[in-house]
Amino acid sequence: MNTNDFDFELPEELIAQTPLEKRDSSKLLIIDHRQKTMVDSHFDHIIDQLNPGDALVMNNTRVLPARLYGEKPDTHGHVELLLLKNTQGDQWEVLAKPAKRLKVGSQVNFGDGRLKATIIDELEHGGRIVEFSYDGIFLEVLESLGEMPLPPYIHEKLEDAERYQTVYAKENGSAAAPTAGLHFTTDLLKKIEAKGVHLVYLTLHVGLGTFRPVSVDNLDEHDMHSEFYSLSEEAAQTLRDVKQAGGRVVAVGTTSIRTLETIGSKFQGDIQADSGWTNIFIKPGYQFKVVDAFSTNFHLPKSTLVMLVSAFAGRDFVLEAYRHAIDEKYRFFSFGDAMFVN
């Protein structure tokens, strides 16, 4: 298939710049790809789409305040680093601006020297490997100096950084939020659990590759970014029990889908505890092995995320649903509305 097969016109005013006051007051488009039906609803009604005995699978990653502003001690030149992933120990892969000033051996100071970064390797496209030095605990230093790395299409200042975290965010490590989970409130999750739905958590640390457009025409030539994932034995056992009892595995967001399908592909459809790096690219033609239904936000044109949704529900029907969402003025992207796919 061709990248342009997943293109659509999106009015800029539909790109949500701020979150709604209430997380679960966003709109929800419920689609059934077998019945070819679409129903306009609101997110707090997602509970009606879940059955007793189902498992609702959520990504409990927490977004790091990963954007750092510092200066070179020799020239006092301003430098911006965006943390992408922890490679080992105190070493991180980062995106640097301006990258051309930062050669191997260069040093950058943050917060009057409370945090220092030394460049130890140069990568393409402005990437660098840095080693940090600091006193105390790295995450505490980062919390005091870093800023939340909002997506490039959000231009408004975020008043409350916690609104770019899910209410169940726990495991530090993401450069972006698993945005399908932003709609859930603690109260809504309690109601879902009281209905007899199993709440299951996994971890996938979201990288900035999630915003990277597909730059090739032929999808088979696309180089998918890799992200770290983890599923515990307790979570895996719950999911196996749910499947065996005839319940559904309902994923919250594309990151949960990618984790579950990575594991399903690795273990021939079985669900096992596992951790590692995944670069799975789910596109039309892929046979789903674990996920039975899911919720997700509305994604960028020509993105791998639109392709993933199309792999499950069919490209033509998904694009028809997107046209409906645009006509009905649904809000798009990270702070936007949601879709439930049966």
Curated annotation (Swiss-Prot):
InterPro entries (alphabetical): QueA, QueA_dom1, QueA_dom2, QueA_sf
Pathway(s) of this molecule: tRNA modification; tRNA-queuosine biosynthesis
HAMAP family, A to Z: QueA (MF_00113)
Compartment list: Cytoplasm
Family: Belongs to the QueA family.
Catalytic function, reaction form: 7-aminomethyl-7-carbaguanosine(34) in tRNA + S-adenosyl-L-methionine = epoxyqueuosine(34) in tRNA + adenine + L-methionine + 2 H(+)
PANTHER family: S-ADENOSYLMETHIONINE:TRNA RIBOSYLTRANSFERASE-ISOMERASE
Pfam families listed in its UniProt record: Queuosine_synth
Gene (name only): queA
Superkingdom of this protein's organism: Bacteria
GO cellular component: cytoplasm
EC number, as in UniProt: 2.4.99.17
Entry GO MF terms: S-adenosylmethionine:tRNA ribosyltransferase-isomerase activity
Name recorded for this polypeptide: S-adenosylmethionine:tRNA ribosyltransferase-isomerase
